[in-house]
């Protein structure tokens, strides 16, 4: 086994001032939200303005900060330059779709075309996340945040979210190319995309504008100077398996990733004879140690940050601020200063 010589913290991410988009994700239940909120807090200390966005339908950042957020950015209590928002997964979905049961008065060709168009839009994987993503990016583009942190949904949803710019770029390009053949349907397309009742030419112009924005976003997501993905896992088989799958998919999509957080690690206490006091803790520690060794072998070119399992949950700005220091100060069980990080 090769020893991981890279710094075991997220300091490299915090120091990379060119980053605009930072995704934090992994398997469900590994502590993604705590990690993403902690990262946003650390970034707020060195960047002009930081926005953290929840794309997880569970919307845990409200619980993490003990403050209610909604679909517009709100200042996080206790911070001058940290903002948060939670987007709804069903934005722009059912209400804007055509009712397939309604008879068309414009003839069979137009009716058939509408059904085909609806199937094209409705058949996109993760259409609810896609519409949410589209509206969210329009909002963010109109603002001036220095860096944006995404607290993402579990792996499958996140991969669809990241595929959306490429997918929609291809779809919009094809729709624009079909303008001459399907001009009567362009107005219908405008309604589906929330562009309002506008003419076919206006719809095409709006689609071109949207396509330009999507192309810029797609390009930025594939630029390692602007975008990176921080993977969060725990030292168990299923989580490690899903992390490897996630990293392979990110690599396939040309999205940079070089940081892994291993969360909820157990550091059992020993008695005066050097024996672990709790047998179950000792067994769990042995399992985690095995997977930590595998992580060190598999990801020797990654910065691997190890975070402890605490006795109580991390909730509220104060506890999150204290916990966030673990991202830049490697955890040391024997250090008295570490114990102070969890105090109010």
UniProtKB/Swiss-Prot annotation:
Q: Where does ATP bind?
A: 27-34, 236, 263
GO BP field: detoxification of arsenic-containing substance; positive regulation of insulin secretion; tail-anchored membrane protein insertion into ER membrane
Q: What EC number(s) does its UniProt record assign?
A: 3.6.-.-
Q: Where in the cell is it found?
A: Cytoplasm; Endoplasmic reticulum
Coarse class of the protein's main subcellular location: cytoplasm
Task: Please name the SUPFAM superfamilies in this protein's record.
Answer: P-loop containing nucleoside triphosphate hydrolases (SSF52540)
- Which cysteine residues pair off into disulfide bonds? none
Residues in a coiled coil are none
Keywords for this entry?
ATP-binding, Cytoplasm, Endoplasmic reticulum, Hydrolase, Metal-binding, Nucleotide-binding, Transport, Zinc
Q: Which domain of life is it from?
A: Eukaryota
Which amino acid positions bind Zn(2+), per UniProt?
A: 278, 281
| Active site: residue positions | 56
The molecular function GO annotations come to: ATP binding; ATP hydrolysis activity; metal ion binding
**InterPro entries per the record?**
Anion-transp_ATPase-like_dom, ATPase_ArsA/GET3, ATPase_ArsA/GET3_euk, P-loop_NTPase
Q: Which GO terms describe its cellular component?
A: axon; GET complex; neuronal cell body
What biological function has been recorded for the protein in this entry?
ATPase required for the post-translational delivery of tail-anchored (TA) proteins to the endoplasmic reticulum. Recognizes and selectively binds the transmembrane domain of TA proteins in the cytosol. This complex then targets to the endoplasmic reticulum by membrane-bound receptors, where the tail-anchored protein is released for insertion. This process is regulated by ATP binding and hydrolysis. ATP binding drives the homodimer towards the closed dimer state, facilitating recognition of newly synthesized TA membrane proteins. ATP hydrolysis is required for insertion.
Family, per the entry? Belongs to the arsA ATPase family.
Its quaternary organisation is: Homodimer.
Q: What is this protein called?
A: ATPase ASNA1 homolog
What organism is the protein native to?
Answer: Brugia malayi
